């Protein structure tokens, strides 16, 4: 099923008739494949690994699919479609990337939900694009059109980093935060409680939902002997984590994973401030699977150490898969679950 934004794009598919099309930041549906009924060829770049995996089975000669923060080549396209990001700070990066891959006077299509900030696009679009105009407005979404009128500045990925020092219970670390990756430029409450109650870990440890690498850097600061692996579903987060660990002189294996599906082998420890916070049924289901999969991926005696919003129903699932529930610290917002398999 197509998202609302994709449905509005599809009803405007004649905009890409017989063209080469790049779709940036595509969503969890099959829109890139659907565009092939009109476009000559389609290339998709997903920044969300789950979205990439959903589309991957449909890859073909005229439908190329990539995951990451940029394309592996300098190919140019007649049209670039940008899904306006939920993290608004990511938008300028996507516009610059779109310009890099557009032919001169190439067409830019931007789609987004009204509640997601798309209405402010005319104020946000860089001057190397023409002033955008509204092509469609339906299903609580807007489609804007523009055209590339000048070459965009050539920017490296490092130009999009916010670099700052962060005090943790394990000492000061350097954080390299790319646009679009969650950051408060200070320890968020949940991570602070997690690190204040950091146990001695051993062997091979997995940092699930690593984000910009705050937990990873603090953990290696205190326990550099660990073999650490860091996973996330977001391409910008994975790159941020890599920059953060490099800045602190640490090494870890960093890779994309949809849940724990791509994590290979067993771990002696799993640590996380898991990104499941809203309490919706779908989110609760993902959190439940995370606990179940963590238990399956831990060695005997392995440690499961996470922080979670205290209102989320982790206890029953942890008891089911670990045999007991060990809350080692808590406050009025968060609980630390620290269970041995």
UniProtKB/Swiss-Prot annotation:
Pfam families hit by this protein:
MTS, MTS_N
What this protein catalyses is:
guanosine(1207) in 16S rRNA + S-adenosyl-L-methionine = N(2)-methylguanosine(1207) in 16S rRNA + S-adenosyl-L-homocysteine + H(+)
Look up the domain of life of the source: Bacteria
Asked whether the keyword Cytoplasm is assigned, the reply is yes
> What is the native source organism of this protein?
Shewanella halifaxensis (strain HAW-EB4)
Can you say what this protein is called? Answer: Ribosomal RNA small subunit methyltransferase C
The annotated subunit structure for this chain is: Monomer.
UniProt keywords, alphabetically = Cytoplasm, Methyltransferase, rRNA processing, S-adenosyl-L-methionine, Transferase
Query: According to its UniProt record, where is this protein mainly located?
Result: cytoplasm
Q: Where in the cell is it found?
A: Cytoplasm
Q: Which GO terms describe its molecular function?
A: 16S rRNA (guanine(1207)-N(2))-methyltransferase activity; nucleic acid binding
Per the UniProt entry, the Enzyme Commission number(s) are 2.1.1.172
One of the record's GO cellular component terms = cytoplasm
**Hey, which family's this protein in?**
Belongs to the methyltransferase superfamily. RsmC family.
Question: HAMAP family in the record, alphabetically?
Answer: 16SrRNA_methyltr_C
What enzyme class is recorded for this protein?
Answer: transferase
This molecule's function is given as:
Specifically methylates the guanine in position 1207 of 16S rRNA in the 30S particle.
